[in-house]
Amino acid sequence: MLDLKQTNRMLRKLERFVDIIEPMIFEKVGEPGPVSAFATLERFHCIPEDSLFDPIEKGYKWGEEFGYCWFKTDFVVPDGLGGKDIFIRPHISGYEGTLWVDGVPYGNFSTKIVFTGHGNHYCDLLKKDAKAGEKIAIDLEYYAGHSYKGCHPTENNPLLTYDFSYEGIDICVKNYAIQEFYFDLRTLVQLVKNLPESSFRRASVINELEKVFKEIYQSPDDVDRDEFMAALERAKPYLKKALSVKNGDDAPKAVLIGHSHMDTAWLWHVGETVKKCARTYANQLALMDEYPEYKFIQSSSCHSDFLRRKYPDLFARIQQKVKEGRYEPNGGVWVECDCNITSGESMVRQFLWGQRFTRKYFDFTSNCFWLPDTFGYSAAIPQIMKGCCVDYFLTTKIDWNDTNTFPLDTFYWEGIDGTKVFTHFNRTHIWPDAEDLMTYVAGTPSNDHSCIKDKRVTDTRVISYGYGDG
């Protein structure tokens, strides 16, 4: 058995090992055919015609403020990849991008938010259960971004550059063994970091991690690939044993659902919001193809109407997922509205137009006023909600207070006329992993002020995970 100093050193090495194997989840197996590009300032809502594209090579430069660049290619599935899930990883710099597969928007790429050395959504599903000989049409739409001086008066916002480049496209497969080991080990390392040192659970996890540490190689460069993978396989049972321990019935619970908050008009033109909605919601459908258990909630009927008008094929696919009960168009209002200076009539119209749209196009009546991103709340909201057949209220930012903290996160809110609505504060901008769930649900030794406030009231918290704004 290791002493305390040795144990801490082992845990640091395992934490580093998590970062080492993360890039190994996707393995390059090829490249697509010749690539052509088309740079433009025009906002297209469909793929531009072929005559506008010119052939390019690696090193191609593009970019100007408010500019877009489209990249066109295809990939023929070789016999060796038949029956496998195929992924695509572009090496294209830019602010954000959309993946189109066989003529329809199917995913998004984000380099603006960096995690583990690369942007989020850096490698997207291209084709589920691909067929040998199948030709896949690939179009990539990238946005260069823009400056927004003056939005933050205290910030010195220098002139941005838009010098972007194309450095190739990789076709990849996923190493599911690496992925499983990565998430299992990451979960257990986070548990150890956030449980009290006096915890018996923590001690039992450390015992299993010590066995894992003795089996694995610290770097894939230490041995050949087969031996590296064999070592992971030998260590796997110890991870599974540690993860098999269940919490008791009185343990707190987290309700997880995917969500991408979308500002209708903030640091960009509304026309760009339309494209943000397309790439974001298309990506949710791709995630549903990859993960059958995945569910997503979208607020703001206005955003659905953007897609109905500009991306009708994508809108039809969303309608199908709503029928399946996997895509929930629940928010109650037309847009997530201001609640400080708006009039009562205006708020009623928000619910009227929001409910009218979801009933007409999704056969869905919203039961929740989903409003995570507002900075104030009219005392008339409960009365207006109930009058519009909306029973539940969810918000977030009042729970960010660090000076006069709000004492509850689940309660009945009573309005000016005595009307009550069931209210819950969720948490956003977090990962659905062990560290964040412990922090915002149960609490940790280093953070006991972000968790469920009054544990006599509830043992459950909603966690909506995912990044927003396209």
Residue ranges and their predicted role:
Residues 68-74, 85-87, 135-137:
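Intrinsic-disorder/low-complexity, polar/charged segments enriched in Ser/Thr/Lys/Arg/Asp/Glu/Gln
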